[in-house]
A protein has these predicted regions:
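Extended amphipathic alpha-helical heptad-repeat regions
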Residues: 21-114
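Classic N-terminal secretory signal peptides
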Residues: 1-21
Length: 114
């Protein structure tokens, strides 16, 4: 009996690696889409935090400009610009992750039709 189970296992493995037996890809694509959506949400949260940080730096810069301390004002302005650049980068990463999730959902739909 063990010999037959082993042979059956080998046959299933061989046919699976040759592509004759398709594993259920739908669940895999759905999991990947969920992971990409979670990643996008993480990037969007980071972008929100960086935007808030940039706003704080801008306020500080304005305060120093009112006090005629232009070196400090320039420093805070540079930090604000840097934070905004990072936020834009995070948003582009989030968009890429959302696009990948959407593609995985499309693949999952196609896999269900087969």
């Amino acid at each position: 009996m063990k010999k037959y189970v082993f042979v059956l296992y080998l046959l299933v493995y061989a046919f699976g690696t040759l592509g004759f037996i398709q594993p259920d890809k739908t669940q895999q694509y759905m999991r990947e889409a969920q992971q990409y959506n979670e990643q996008a949400e993480k990037y969007e949260r980071e972008a929100q935090q960086l935007t808030q940080q940039a706003n704080n730096y801008t306020r500080q810069s304005e305060n120093y400009a009112r006090k005629k301390d232009f070196n400090q004002s320039r420093t805070y302005t540079n930090w604000a610009n840097e934070a905004l650049s990072k936020a834009q980068l995070r948003m582009s990463w989030a968009k890429d992750a959302r696009d990948k999730a959407q593609l995985r959902m499309k693949w999952a739909e196609e896999a269900m039709k087969r």
